[in-house]
Amino acid sequence: MATHKLLLLPGDGIGTEVMAEVKRLIDWLNAQGIAHFETEDGLVGGAAYDADKVAITDATMAKAQASDAVIFGAVGGAKWDGVPYEARPEAGLLRLRKDLGLFANLRPAVCYPALADSSSLKREVVEGLDIMIVRELTGGVYFGEPKTITDLGNGQKRAIDTQVYDSYEIDRIARVAFDLARKRRNKVTSMEKRNVMKSGVLWNEVVTRVHAEDYKDVQLEHQLADSGGMNLVKWPKQFDVIVTDNLFGDILSDIAAMLTGSLGMLPSASLGAVDANTGKRKSMYEPVHGSAPDIAGKGLANPVAMLASFGMALRYSLDMGELADKLDAAIAAVLAKGLRTADIKSEGSTVISTSQMGEAILKEMQALHA
């Protein structure tokens, strides 16, 4: 049985509480001989700053480089608002993404049948929803230069941000999207603003070329990003895989997130390039929700997104798709029984704590392996 090396970075706030439920599941999988995980813990974010005055140490980064996957909790909180900019908690997350070369962000938006009434949209619009948004993570306007604010000397200022994409950056993210679609419902929707942005013209051109060269078996459509945002709300089940740039991906993935009813339900993955020698890629998995310091330590946090992020690691980094399917089924079964953390409570449901939710999901996993 293969040994999988995992680096666990709980971070701040509720990160430690939801990560505890992943550890509980890992311990059980190891004890049952279902899988073999070697885990190491590390500090990141505010916890790392308190200990070492940096958001992540070089030693922890070395562990991340050596791992098969990084499992990340959440960082940040008002406690660290006054720390130097380069040491702010979020800098640890950004360094992980940069140094591991994580260019592809995968954000699934899945609406469990038991939670369809928690969405702000009608049940018939969102029930059965299963979208994967593939966001380019290391290019675009967030990283382009120049990025300045200039005093014009006449009482006015000018701000400049620069949207930059090279062909290879678009090519590789497109391939991630097409490969995912082949394992799903075989459809990719590419979103950009080619009508007003040159980067959108190039994006459309490269995605179209990659499709024609290597993925003719996958259905490809193009939508302008603003129209795509409208369609995400109007008719979301038309989408399978959406691929888009950094800025639009940031916006569209948050829109898709709220179709499902709660940020506490949503996992994500960030992937690097496939190593030509090993066939593996650097990766990090994290819930979409933040550190939520206002509820930290109260047992109110929803661990589903953290557990589902571990499920994505099983599927995309550890070649354990069957086990990931069972974890997804366990989560769905718990929700179908009406068990809820406070963020997803509804009339007639039973509200339980973070640890009780983790325990309930583990019991369903045990039943599936009986």
From Swiss-Prot:
One of its GO terms (molecular function) is 3-isopropylmalate dehydrogenase activity. Keywords: Amino-acid biosynthesis, Branched-chain amino acid biosynthesis, Cytoplasm, Leucine biosynthesis, Magnesium, Manganese, Metal-binding, NAD, Oxidoreductase. Substrate binds at residues 97, 107, 135, 226. It is found in: Cytoplasm. Coiled coil: none annotated. One of its GO terms (cellular component) is cytosol. It is an enzyme of class 1 (oxidoreductase). Its EC number is 1.1.1.85. It catalyses: (2R,3S)-3-isopropylmalate + NAD(+) = 4-methyl-2-oxopentanoate + CO2 + NADH. Binds 1 Mg(2+) or Mn(2+) ion per subunit. Its cofactor is Mg(2+); Mn(2+). Its main location: cytoplasm. Mg(2+) binds at residues 226, 250, 254. GO terms for biological process: L-leucine biosynthetic process. NAD(+) binds at residues 77-90, 290-302. The record marks 142, 193 as: Important for catalysis. Belongs to the isocitrate and isopropylmalate dehydrogenases family. LeuB type 1 subfamily. HAMAP family: LeuB_type1 (MF_01033). NCBIfam families: leuB. Catalyzes the oxidation of 3-carboxy-2-hydroxy-4-methylpentanoate (3-isopropylmalate) to 3-carboxy-4-methyl-2-oxopentanoate. The product decarboxylates to 4-methyl-2 oxopentanoate. This is 3-isopropylmalate dehydrogenase.
